[in-house]
Amino acid sequence: ALHAVKSGLKAAIVQAADMGGSCVNRGCIPSKALLAASGRVRELRDKHHLQSFGIQVGDVQFERSAIADHAGSLVSKIQGDLTNSLTRLGVDTIRGWGTLAGGQKVTVATADGEKTYTAKDIMLSPGSIPFVPPGIETDGKTVFTSDEAIRLDWLPQWIAIIGSGYIGLEFSDVYTALGCEVSMIE
């Protein structure tokens, strides 16, 4: 949308969920915030390394909820900044779920009903959802996806992470830094 506006085109975004998609809300941004905070915990707990610099620290404590709140605050700020930028540039945001309705048409389902829009060009940017292998059911507590993990609602003593892509590896780093034992399954 930003590129289209800068190229002189009129643009609109059909957005069913939070502005910013997967990266801003459940991926890149909150995971990097969790990595930064948990990385500080790991560094401060490495007493031997710190002593080599002449630094001595006592027990390192952290508030799990404050770390999660920090990530959430960063997400909210970026969502707001993105929304404000789009509004300032004249990009319309249509809240709802869009489906293609033929050539150059999108039908958007909202709480108020459906409306069809016509556009010269339509770009599909559906985002992503975590992959859950067939036969596995998530309950959000004992079996959960990265979408739940990003909230850092609890710290299990042991956690198995299925998938060693960048999200799995980042969560492995976060959870081990905060004291959890992690097993990676690929």
Stretches found by the model and what they are:
Residues 1-4, 171:
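Hydrophobic residues within alpha-helices
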Residues 3-9, 14-155:
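Glycine-rich flavin
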Residues 153-186:
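Rossmann-like NAD(P)H-binding beta-loop-alpha module
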